[in-house]
Amino acid sequence: MDQFQHISVVDAQEKLQQQDLNAVLVDIRDPQSFIRGHVENAFHLTNDTIVELMNEVDFEQPVLVMCYHGHSSQGAAQYLVNQGYEEVYSVDGGFEGWHKAGLPVEK
């Protein structure tokens, strides 16, 4: 895949729940927002944690990127594609869309 794909919050949740896919959600919001609430098991991706992500997540695993509203995640998703990740999605609507859809959040 040379490009990331877009995914809705509902489809993102479904993909994360499929155990056989071993999908990973990365949240690129600021630390304070992440602490206030995030998707369960989300990886907080920052400039300081990118190496950790690349060491822990195989390039074949689906990676879903979430930001506030679904805009900044597109740049981060393309960056991950450029690093070699094969199946990368930008979550349309971001955390706001996830929260408005009533999907589960942990604090």
Swiss-Prot record:
Query: Does Transcription show up as a keyword for this record?
Result: no
One Gene Ontology cellular component term attached to this UniProt record is:
cytoplasm
Where, if anywhere, are coiled coils annotated? none
The EC number of this protein is: 2.8.1.1
What is the reaction catalyzed? thiosulfate + hydrogen cyanide = thiocyanate + sulfite + 2 H(+); thiosulfate + [thioredoxin]-dithiol = [thioredoxin]-disulfide + hydrogen sulfide + sulfite + 2 H(+)
- The organism's superkingdom is given as Bacteria
Keywords from the UniProt entry: Cytoplasm, Transferase
The primary site where this protein sits is cytoplasm
Where does the UniProt annotation locate this protein? Cytoplasm
Q: Name one GO molecular function term.
A: thiosulfate-cyanide sulfurtransferase activity
Q: Which family does it belong to?
A: Belongs to the GlpE family.
Function text: Transferase that catalyzes the transfer of sulfur from thiosulfate to thiophilic acceptors such as cyanide or dithiols. May function in a CysM-independent thiosulfate assimilation pathway by catalyzing the conversion of thiosulfate to sulfite, which can then be used for L-cysteine biosynthesis.
Can you name this protein? Answer: Thiosulfate sulfurtransferase GlpE
